[in-house]
Curated annotation (Swiss-Prot):
Subunit of the F-type ATPase which has 2 components, CF(1) - the catalytic core - and CF(0) - the membrane proton channel. This is ATP synthase F(0) complex subunit B1, mitochondrial. It holds the Pfam family Mt_ATP-synt_B. Belongs to the eukaryotic ATPase B chain family. Mitochondrial membrane ATP synthase (F(1)F(0) ATP synthase or Complex V) produces ATP from ADP in the presence of a proton gradient across the membrane which is generated by electron transport complexes of the respiratory chain. F-type ATPases consist of two structural domains, F(1) - containing the extramembraneous catalytic core, and F(0) - containing the membrane proton channel, linked together by a central stalk and a peripheral stalk. During catalysis, ATP synthesis in the catalytic domain of F(1) is coupled via a rotary mechanism of the central stalk subunits to proton translocation. The gene is asb-1. It is found in: Mitochondrion; Mitochondrion inner membrane. It comes from Caenorhabditis elegans. GO terms for molecular function: proton transmembrane transporter activity. One of its GO terms (cellular component) is mitochondrion. Keywords: CF(0), Hydrogen ion transport, Ion transport, Membrane, Mitochondrion, Mitochondrion inner membrane, Transit peptide, Transport. Residues 1-21 form a transit peptide.
Length: 301
């Protein structure tokens, strides 16, 4: 039972008779929401047509159907004047280039170059007749034997066509985006290396300039340094001599003071010993007593 039996003929005509490319053109539904049937709303939803109550067109899963993807920027090629060695023969042995698109084919898998060789002699239909006859001959003579599941090849071909026409555009765009990200990553590494090389070159240039300035001012700087060293050595020697003279003067002063003190002590000791020796004699004591008695007598008179 088809869906057309559930809707009126007018609704059926509006649902299934739609111009090609309506999904990508974002057509507008009729202004009256009541005139849109249930199945027609489903059809508009699948085709990406906004309803009167919607301000923006919904994102449809069939927007990318039957679209041919083309790269906004081709793959980078090797420069013509690039050689990794001067002896490299670029004429006979050029660098291999990575094609952006696969080579042109016919019947999904046969190279176009096989057909163009026949067209010069047999015309446009000649290659198809030749390969068709060759295929029929191989199958008829059982030189090319199909397996029991050989008929499933038709299903795989249909599946390939379905996937390539529905999701092929998004797959190609995603792969190209991943490729650009990968190339950007490697370019970032190259830029970092170049930045390090530039920084190293700048640092080397600054060091070279500083060495040149140092070389130019080396005699003057050496002379100034020598004068400073001589002055420092002179001040050090003067300070050493001053300390040594001060130490020797203090030593001589202490020596003289010690010598004078020793002589004074010895002299006092000698005097004391002499006095004590004289006082201890009896004659001296008798003379001293007589002298004292006479003085007392003189005082009494």
């Amino acid at each position: 039972m088809s869906l057309s039996r559930l809707s009126s003929p007018q609704t059926f005509s509006r649902v299934f008779i739609v111009a090609r490319g309506a999904a990508t053109g974002h057509a507008v539904a009729p202004s009256s929401d009541n005139s849109i049937g249930y199945f027609e709303k489903i059809a508009y939803r699948f085709k990406g047509i906004p309803l009167p109550t919607e301000t923006e067109a919904p994102k449809s899963m069939f927007d990318a159907c039957n679209k041919e993807w083309s790269a906004p920027e081709l793959l980078p090629s090797v420069p013509k004047d690039f050689k990794e060695h001067p002896d490299r023969d670029l004429t006979n042995y050029p660098y291999p280039s990575r094609p952006m698109y696969p080579p042109k084919t016919r019947l999904l898998m046969m190279p176009d170059s096989w057909f163009t060789a026949f067209q010069k002699v047999t015309g446009t239909s000649g290659p198809y007749l030749f390969f068709g006859g060759l295929f029929a001959f191989l199958v008829n003579k059982e030189l090319w034997v199909f397996e029991e599941q050989g008929h499933m090849t038709v299903g795989w071909i249909l599946f390939y066509l379905l996937v390539s026409r529905t999701a092929g555009y998004k797959i190609d765009a995603g792969l190209y985006k991943d490729y650009q990200e990968r190339v950007g990553f490697f370019k970032g590494l190259i830029q970092e290396d170049l930045k390090e090389a530039v920084d190293f070159r700048k640092t080397s240039a600054a060091q070279t300039a500083s060495f040149a300035a140092l070389k130019e001012g080396m005699p003057t700087s050496l002379k100034d340094s020598m004068q400073l060293q001589l002055e420092a050595a002179y001040r050090k020697n003067v300070q050493t001599i001053s300390n040594e003279i001060k130490r020797r003067i203090e030593y001589l002063k202490e020596t003289e003071e010690t010598k004078a003190r020793f002589e004074r002590d010895q002299l006092l000791k000698l005097i004391n010993d002499s006095v004590e020796k004289q006082v201890s004699q009896k004659d001296f004591q008798e003379k001293f007593l007589q002298n004292a008695i006479q003085q007392l007598k003189g005082i009494a008179v």
